[in-house]
């Protein structure tokens, strides 16, 4: 298992959690997820 894959899965789960919390649909492209990882990583 690659760390990048784990981070990507975690980012997707976190995005889903945020979507549920906000009560509105938030869709991120893989590029946006990568940008988020770069900012926070």
Curated annotation (Swiss-Prot):
Record PTM Histidine amide, positions in chain: 40
Cellular component GO terms held in the UniProt record: extracellular region
Tissue: Expressed by the venom gland.
Main location: secreted
Keyword line: Amidation, Secreted, Signal
Residues in the signal sequence: 1-25
Cell compartments where the protein resides: Secreted
Function, in words: Venom protein with unknown function. Does not induce paralysis when a high dose is administered by intrathoracic injection into the blowfly Lucilia caesar.
Name recorded for this polypeptide: U15-myrmicitoxin-Tb1b
Organism classification: Eukaryota, Metazoa, Ecdysozoa, Arthropoda, Hexapoda
């Amino acid at each position: 298992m690659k760390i990048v894959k784990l981070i990507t899965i975690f980012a997707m789960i976190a995005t889903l959690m945020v979507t549920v919390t906000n009560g509105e649909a938030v869709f991120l492209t893989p590029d946006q997820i990568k940008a988020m990882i770069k900012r926070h990583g």
